[in-house]
Regions:
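Membrane-interface alpha helices of multi-pass inner-membrane proteins
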Residues: 86-102, 108-115, 132-138, 210-219
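Transmembrane-helix motifs of polytopic, lipid-linked glycan transferases
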Residues: 11-35, 39, 46, 70
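Specific aromatic-rich, kink-prone transmembrane helix
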Residues: 23, 64-81, 86, 93-94, ...
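Membrane-interface transmembrane helices that cradle and orient dolichyl/undecaprenyl
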Residues: 71-88, 116, 187-202
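Perimembrane helix-loop-helix junctions
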Residues: 107-133, 193-200, 237, 243-249
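Hydrophobic/aromatic-rich transmembrane helices and adjacent perimembrane loops
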Residues: 221-254
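Short periplasmic/luminal acceptor-recognition loop of GT-C membrane glycosyltransferases, typified by
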Residues: 105-109, 287-340, 346-370
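Hydrophobic, aromatic-rich transmembrane alpha-helices
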Residues: 181-212, 239
Length: 399
């Protein structure tokens, strides 16, 4: 392997983003008309694509949204013409969305609740059929997994034990939420204000969709900025309705508020267009300084390892594996995984001290940042030697 292409990832993100915008426009047109759909698409493709919530990245939220929004469109078709096929399609697409990102149940949950809410007992059977269809791809994935235990842990147990709003201290989760609010305000504020302009005309299905998307963001617990991407499609739908209402009723005062919010969004975003890539990375990813040195580190790794050899990036920066074309020597590639999964740190130590150590250890983070006991540092001191420092990043090779 010669390494992955960042340009390929960007192109795929652009295609996925365009698909989500297009399908959201169709959903909006079916629920509210062409003018709201046009406004929803424009809003989603501009302010909804805010860099502050990392909307330009090929995130799990973006990829899952392709399936989630498509599932809602299938459900809208079912409401227009109650053919069971559309209901089953909505369920299957919901299941696919959840397989991409466990939090991407929002559209499917909104559809199921909508059926019961509006049809009472008559909605129970179709809602059950939708939910049953959603489980089909999930069951297939579980049945075909190499290890059902590992699959179950990755899909269910990990979140339940280590990483959700229900784990950790309430104070810590509240602090993380507060830290994410500035990015959420800059990324979603204008959309939310535009949506509020037409709140009296919001369709129940759109309200439920936004509600479940918000619940999914909160449920993740860590409040990473990219979590908020999940709220963009339902907010865009409601923003399209709000924008159409402003045009219809000529609400000058509210239009002025929205205009100020849009201007503020442009004001804080436009400078990034003219910044260098490193400056952009510092602004958008302040907690990931390795992004500014990854290119140099990747060149070194490629030059000093062969395809087929394994490396270990300590403790995070999984992009280095992809960009260098070298496989990881350890199964967990994110800081939080090793920090939160019981026994993961011990497994990492055993891997480093084992008979087949990685060809290189890239010290993106210090050993003590994960292991203050000093045991990982002692393994590096006795089993490895520092062979280079690339852009401030120490690199070790086995002795």
């Amino acid at each position: 392997m010669d390494g992955g292409s960042a340009e390929a990832l960007r192109a795929l993100a652009a295609v996925a983003g365009a698909l989500v915008v297009a399908v959201t426009m169709v959903v909006t047109a079916r629920l509210a008309g062409r003018i709201p759909a046009t406004i929803a698409g424009l809003a989603m493709a501009t302010v909804g694509a805010a860099p502050f919530i990392e909307s330009f990245t090929l995130s799990g939220e973006l990829l899952a949204s392709v399936f989630a929004v498509a599932s809602l469109l299938a459900f809208v078709f079912y409401l227009e013409r109650p053919a069971p096929g559309w209901l089953i399609a909505a369920g299957l697409l919901t299941g696919c969305a959840v397989l991409v990102k466990q939090s991407a149940f929002d559209a499917g949950a909104a559809a199921a609740v909508y059926l019961v809410w509006t049809r009472r007992r008559g909605g129970v059977a179709p809602a059950a059929a939708l939910v049953a269809a959603a489980f089909v791809p999930v069951v297939i994935a579980a049945a075909t997994a190499q290890s059902f235990h590992d699959w179950w842990y990755a899909m269910v147990t990990y979140r339940d034990q280590a990483d959700s709003i229900l784990t950790g201290s309430f104070h810590t989760r509240l602090h993380q939420a507060r830290l994410s609010l500035p990015a959420a305000e800059r990324g979603l504020g204008a959309l939310a204000l535009l949506a509020l302009a037409g709140w009296r005309r919001w369709p129940l299905l759109g309200v439920l969709w936004l509600g479940f998307a918000t619940l999914a963001v909160i449920g993740g617990g860590n409040f990473h900025n990219h979590y908020y991407q999940q709220m963009v499609p339902p907010l865009a739908l409601l923003a399209g309705i709000g924008g159409a209402e402003l045009l219809r009723r000529r609400k000058v005062a509210w239009a002025a508020v929205v205009a100020i919010a849009l201007a503020a969004t442009v004001f804080v975003t436009a400078p990034l267009w003219f910044d260098s890539p490193n400056a952009q990375a510092r602004t958008i990813f302040p907690d990931d300084p390795h992004l500014q040195t990854d290119a140099q580190v990747v060149r070194y790794v490629r030059a000093h390892t062969r395809p087929g050899q394994h490396i270990f990036v300590m403790w995070a920066a999984a992009d280095l594996y992809y960009l260098s074309g070298r496989d990881p020597s350890f199964r967990y590639m994110w800081f939080r995984n090793i920090q939160a999964i019981p026994g993961a740190l011990g497994q990492a130590r055993r891997m480093l001290a084992g008979k087949r150590p990685p060809a290189l250890v890239v010290g993106i983070n210090s050993p003590a940042s994960m292991d203050p006991s000093g045991r990982t540092q002692r393994i590096l001191d006795t089993r490895f030697r520092k062979v280079a420092t690339v852009a401030g990043v120490p690199i070790y090779a086995p002795r």
